[in-house]
UniProtKB/Swiss-Prot annotation:
Annotated catalysed reactions: malonyl-[ACP] + acetyl-CoA + H(+) = 3-oxobutanoyl-[ACP] + CO2 + CoA
Entry protein name: Beta-ketoacyl-[acyl-carrier-protein] synthase III
One of the GO BP terms on file: fatty acid biosynthetic process
Similarity section: Belongs to the thiolase-like superfamily. FabH family.
Superkingdom assignment: Bacteria
InterPro entries the record matches: ACP_syn_III_C, ACP_syn_III_N, FabH, Thiolase-like
Keyword Transcription appears in the UniProt entry: no
Source organism per UniProt: Aromatoleum aromaticum (strain DSM 19018 / LMG 30748 / EbN1) (Azoarcus sp. (strain EbN1))
Purpose: Catalyzes the condensation reaction of fatty acid synthesis by the addition to an acyl acceptor of two carbons from malonyl-ACP. Catalyzes the first condensation reaction which initiates fatty acid synthesis and may therefore play a role in governing the total rate of fatty acid production. Possesses both acetoacetyl-ACP synthase and acetyl transacylase activities. Its substrate specificity determines the biosynthesis of branched-chain and/or straight-chain of fatty acids.
Keywords: Acyltransferase, Cytoplasm, Fatty acid biosynthesis, Fatty acid metabolism, Lipid biosynthesis, Lipid metabolism, Multifunctional enzyme, Transferase
Entry note about domains: The last Arg residue of the ACP-binding site is essential for the weak association between ACP/AcpP and FabH.
Gene Ontology annotations for the cellular component aspect, listed alphabetically: cytoplasm
Region (ACP-binding): 249-253
GO-annotated molecular function: 3-oxoacyl-[acyl-carrier-protein] synthase activity; beta-ketoacyl-acyl-carrier-protein synthase III activity
Amino acid sequence: MIYARIAGTGSFLPGEPITNDDLVARGIDTSDQWIIERTGIRSRHLASAEMSSSDLAKTASERALDAAGVRPDDIDLIIVATSTPDCIFPSTAALLQSKLGIRNGAAAFDVQAVCSGFVYGLTIAEKFIRSGSHKRALVVGAEVFSRILDWSDRGTCVLFGDGAGAVVLEAAEAPGILASALHADGSHHPILCVPGAVAAGQVVGDPFLRMDGQAVFKFAVRVLGDVALEVLDQAGVTVDSVDWLIPHQANIRILQATARRLGVSMDKVITTVDHHGNTSAASIPLALDLAVRDGRIRPGHRFIIEGVGGGFTWGAALLQF
């Protein structure tokens, strides 16, 4: 039986931290207290104008490859989860492949499930590996959400940051992914979306992120609890056997509400939203890499990753490191 396991993790945050006070100094009608009380966010990172999602992904990927002890040409599958691709086409995954110097014909494609994207990408990669068609995958979440924010809308622009996280997933004799579940319900698309599009060389409609925060909160807490319980049930284990919970880092209130529903202490929740903001598809692999490198997540530990994002999409996976 072929299984899949994480062999290495990596991440990258562009530039210096941008504090809430820095945003106020830039003219945004908000305050440090207002942002912290509602979101738990104290700072975030924003990419410079010349940096793209594939640039962020490249550095995160190089760090994951180094941690796994493999060369770029050892990768035979590249999946990039992003809602802020470098261009309409080719895929950001193909551009990343070129930047990493991978010339072996590895398959490369993007996944667009917004903040659930990394869970989707990891689950897809695991299926490829377990089928025997591929042996080693590079799965990346990379975003430059600062490009799609309306900086006059203080209800959204203060929430997001830019960054990338990556894992190397490889074939193994013992399971590293114990269970997974993916879901979507497109009827909820109006509560979190970028409604605009490009047509005939013009931007048609609204090109900025729009969100109904209260509706998103209620939906997110419900489905994050449900999908975590779903993967636990699939694996035949209880939440008490899980060492860590790594949710999508949307805001601290969603993390706290999800932990309460699952009966998990916040001490077991990997939290980065305070210093990263919401980095969409990058948030889970960023948090995972941080926890691996600081020694919290160690070999043998079990953890749940889970995300919810525009679409609406949601998903979770139970892993053993």
